[in-house]
Amino acid sequence: MEIPEEPANSGHSLPPVYIYSPEYVSICDSLVKVPKRASMVHSLIEAYALHKQMRIVKPKVASMEEMATFHTDAYLQHLQKVSQEGDEDHPDSIEYGLGYDCPATEGIFDYAAAIGGGTITAAQCLIDGKCKVAINWSGGWHHAKKDEASGFCYLNDAVLGILRLRRKFDRILYVDLDLHHGDGVEDAFSFTSKVMTVSLHKFSPGFFPGTGDMSDVGLGKGRYYSVNVPIQDGIQDEKYYHICESVLKEVYQAFNPKAVVLQLGADTIAGDPMCSFNMTPVGIGKCLKYVLQWQLATLILGGGGYNLANTARCWTYLTGVILGKTLSSEIPDHEFFTAYGPDYVLEITPSCRPDRNEPHRIQQILNYIKGNLKHVV
């Protein structure tokens, strides 16, 4: 089954950078919403021996100063305080978004600093020319605001990564393929024309975070530099790729980015408890290949993904896409092998749910976006 393909980053002899250390995986495993997910992802990548074809870089921990390039001092200090005490009932926590979906558990500050550091380290590798593609599957926490946690996200590592890349690259394109709207990243850059944010996501009444309608286009100097593609339940690979390619083609021509940050949350994949989109890693892989053919400095991040085995399948497959490797269908024996039953294969089959996306509505959205991008100079 091992058919060598043209690597997706062909033309670049530099191997991708892969952010990893045992300590990093161990701290990322501690997130209550995705326990041990980081270990499952890394173990499967290792089982397919993909780590041997990448440059493994140990992440630094983000300093207070680095985190404060986006987050407020007051928020960071509060996060540090409750993290040391494991104080879930601090009276100020509610105003900082802590509690409910972002519990203030002990050690949460160290977790946030580790993730932020992972993405900043990856961005720095791109700046230093150590690679053309840098991967931090444990990053991609796109909901956090400058002064509040939101949607399982305590620190917005995607924003920190973009800010770091801006030291070298003038125009940065952020593409968010998570099931949820990348609201924290969009908000952070809504007033600037230096960062364009593109988000494909589920948009429906009562679905978190409730933002990201196609009329959300940015503000002030950043007007038309936010692109939102609202999608309904049941979408599958072919239609999703058609939408993604159509939008990215227009975006690339209009904006001419110098670097790309790609958030690849796996909660769009069939079998996710979110039970919304009906994608497989192959569809996301086609979108990834489309971005990689631009041959720009590219920072790859994870994000959502609550069916842990499917998330590991997805990100391992996508790592294979980046390396130009076709992976064997049989899951290799490794520490988490039993999680891949009953069939123990890499492929994911879409479920039999109806696709709620009507072709004329999709065309309307694409036409609207194309019209908006005419204003981008």
UniProtKB/Swiss-Prot annotation:
Active site, UniProt feature: 143 (proton acceptor)
UniProt cofactor note: Binds 1 divalent metal cation per subunit.
Any one of the GO BP annotations: mitotic sister chromatid cohesion
Entry's localization field: Nucleus; Chromosome; Cytoplasm
Region of interest called Histone deacetylase, as start-end residue ranges on this chain: 14-324
UniProt modified residues of type Phosphoserine: 39
This protein's GO CC annotations: chromosome; cytoplasm; nucleus
Membership in a protein family: Belongs to the histone deacetylase family. HD type 1 subfamily.
Protein name, per record: Histone deacetylase 8
Lineage per the UniProt record: Eukaryota, Metazoa, Chordata, Craniata, Vertebrata
Gene: Hdac8
